[in-house]
Swiss-Prot record:
Name of the protein in its database record: ATP synthase subunit delta
Swiss-Prot/TrEMBL keywords: ATP synthesis, Cell inner membrane, Cell membrane, CF(1), Hydrogen ion transport, Ion transport, Membrane, Transport
Gene this chain is encoded by: atpH
Compartments, record wording: Cell inner membrane
Function text: F(1)F(0) ATP synthase produces ATP from ADP in the presence of a proton or sodium gradient. F-type ATPases consist of two structural domains, F(1) containing the extramembraneous catalytic core and F(0) containing the membrane proton channel, linked together by a central stalk and a peripheral stalk. During catalysis, ATP synthesis in the catalytic domain of F(1) is coupled via a rotary mechanism of the central stalk subunits to proton translocation.
Superkingdom classification of source: Bacteria
Gene3D superfamilies documented for this protein: N-terminal domain of the delta subunit of the F1F0-ATP synthase
Amino acid sequence: MKQTILARRYAKAVFSIGADSGKYGEYNDALQAVANLYMTNPDVVDALTNPLYPLELREKVMVGIVKSMDIDAVMSNFLNLLVEKKRAEILPEIAEEFQAMVDDAQNLSHGSVISAVELSEELQGKIQQTLEKLTGKKVELTTSVDPSIIGGIVAKVGDLVLDGSIKTQLAGLKESIKGRE
């Protein structure tokens, strides 16, 4: 079950400490690394969140992770607090919320472009510039190819979706023809 509100609160607390000390980038790297460990190793999740294991054992596991990743004292205390408060299961959500806060602080958005064919570097650059003008933020794009859109592109940045695909245009034309019958 997603606990976004709680994750956002934890992320906001750590972000404010990181922003005050100028280490939010370092904290973000640490959180992303631990969240990645969660995603790739289910045994770690079990060792940190399973209530059948004594709290002392779960804390030792987190201490081991912190030492192996050479994480600074503040972040180490935060990660240990999550284990102590039985909130370690929301660590990936906290990392996601923290990343969003870092992106916002750096005036950065992540976007995606789907096209029917592979786009040239030049065209990707033009699309990126256009999206940056529309959003007022620096945009990091990921591109993918989906032949089912027939032609054109679908660009997404945050809540903004620009669908210029032939597939969507044909669907709109079909609906307008149906409406006249």
